[in-house]
From Swiss-Prot:
Protein name as it appears in the record: UPF0179 protein Mthe_0220
Pfam families documented for this protein: UPF0179
HAMAP family named among the record's database cross-references: UPF0179
Family: Belongs to the UPF0179 family.
Length: 149
């Protein structure tokens, strides 16, 4: 599998740590007039990213981050998700469909509907991690898989 693409973006100095993962939420009203907006807002909202490296020591002023922002290199993080066991094969290319379940107070709900993935995303099952940590309340046979867009 090809190495995931990397991007340079800006993140709050306090958050700029190699290995840190975050979900990019998109711009706020304060960002509209910022001269760094294009560099800060070059990620896709709702996606999970991991910081691979810090680029230099320069700190830029930011109205949202009291200690400013720094340039970092990021990549989209793989996601652990629960999937139908019958469709869980390492190396498979899939179109992601979350488990059809609306039991939002279930302890498995977040792993069945992981943040960072959207219905219809084209993904590769990098690895079948193992069995789901609990039985499904709806009776589905689930496996945990690592997915990469």
């Amino acid at each position: 599998m090809a190495e995931p693409a990397t991007q340079i973006t800006l993140i709050g100095t306090k958050l700029a740590t190699i290995g840190m993962e975050f979900i990019f939420n998109g711009p706020t009203p304060e960002c509209e007039s910022c001269k760094l907006r294009n560099t800060c807002m070059n990620l896709e909202p709702g996606r999970r990213y991991r910081i691979l490296g810090i680029k230099g020591e320069l700190v830029h002023e930011c109205p949202l981050h009291e200690e400013g922002v720094r340039a970092v290199e990021v990549t989209e993080s793989p996601t652990i998700a629960a999937m139908d066991a019958r469709k869980s094969f390492a190396g498979s290319k899939i179109i992601y469909e979350p488990i059809n379940c609306d039991v939002t107070d279930c302890r498995m709900y977040d792993i069945c509907h992981p943040a960072g993935l959207k219905r219809g995303d084209r993904c590769t099952i990098v690895e079948v991690v193992g069995e789901a940590p609990e039985e499904c309340a709806r009776g589905y046979k689930l496996k945990l898989v690592e997915l990469r867009r």
